[in-house]
């Protein structure tokens, strides 16, 4: 038996099944439920499998209507009412968030998820200094050029949400000068709480560290730059599903 196989046809007696991608149509549901029958452990890999990711951007009326009118004509799979996480249809043993998860996280998920050590949030792995006397008045981002490599990106006017995002990725984005967009999902401090609590915490961080007007901040936090990942916070809170235990999220 090969070590790694990419297929919808799952052989018998498989130790671990890695599932990536959201569940968007009835064919996805069929393949997913069929695949998990012959495996011992299921790992949901990446933002799409856990919360829909990029495909959730297609959950708009005009997109659904287009597929409904053309699906029967071209014998296409039927769209579901929205993009669903994997655990809407099957049980998941471990969640591996990230867009994408790093090689280190993949190794930990396969070899020793309980023994993996990570900081509480991305800020704990970033290494940049937070300054009390440097408070930007507006979100400027790269308008002022490349950021100072030593100073916190929030202090420099970047929309960075590393304070509330779970660690483990080793902060490659912020170390390279790009703000964290939250692709790893909420840190353990918020993972079993309502999504409104996480959003309010992000707002408080910016209120404490910046002089950015509340209206500008609220608009920025709901912008396309962040919405693709921040919307996933509500999926961790459960909604009509069971709340995801932080012990099952790497």
Language-model regions, residue ranges each:
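Short, hinge-like loop/turn segments at secondary-structure boundaries
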Residues: 60-63
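Active-site-proximal loop->helix
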Residues: 56-57
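Short gly/pro/ser/thr-enriched loop/turn and capping motifs at secondary-structure boundaries
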Residues: 48-53
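Iron-sulfur (Fe-S) cluster-binding modules
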Residues: 1-18, 33-41, 66-95, 100-250
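Thiamine diphosphate
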Residues: 21-31
């Amino acid at each position: 038996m090969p070590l790694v196989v990419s297929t919808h046809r799952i052989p018998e007696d498989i130790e671990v099944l890695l599932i990536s991608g959201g569940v968007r149509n009835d064919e996805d549901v069929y393949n997913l439920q069929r695949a998990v029958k012959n495996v011992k452990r299921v790992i949901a890999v990446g933002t799409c499998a856990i919360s829909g990711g990029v495909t959730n951007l297609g959950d708009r009326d005009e997109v659904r209507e287009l597929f409904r009118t053309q699906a029967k004509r071209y014998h296409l799979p039927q769209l579901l009412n929205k993009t669903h996480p994997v655990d809407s249809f099957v049980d998941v043993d471990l969640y591996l968030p990230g867009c994408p998860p790093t090689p280190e996280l993949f190794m930990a998920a396969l070899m020793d998820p309980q023994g993996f050590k990570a900081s509480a949030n991305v800020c704990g792995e970033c290494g940049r200094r937070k300054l009390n006397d440097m408070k930007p008045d507006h979100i400027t981002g790269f308008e002022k050029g490349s950021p100072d490599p030593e100073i916190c990106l929030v202090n420099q006017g970047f929309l960075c949400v590393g304070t509330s995002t779970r660690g483990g990725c080793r902060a490659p984005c912020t170390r390279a000068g790009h703000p964290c967009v939250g692709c790893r999902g909420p840190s353990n401090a918020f993972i079993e709480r309502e999504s409104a609590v996480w959003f309010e915490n992000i707002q408080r961080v910016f209120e404490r560290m910046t002089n950015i007007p509340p209206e500008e901040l609220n608009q920025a936090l709901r912008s396309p730059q962040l919405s693709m990942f921040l919307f996933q916070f509500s999926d961790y809170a459960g909604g009509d599903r069971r709340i995801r235990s932080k012990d099952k999220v790497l």
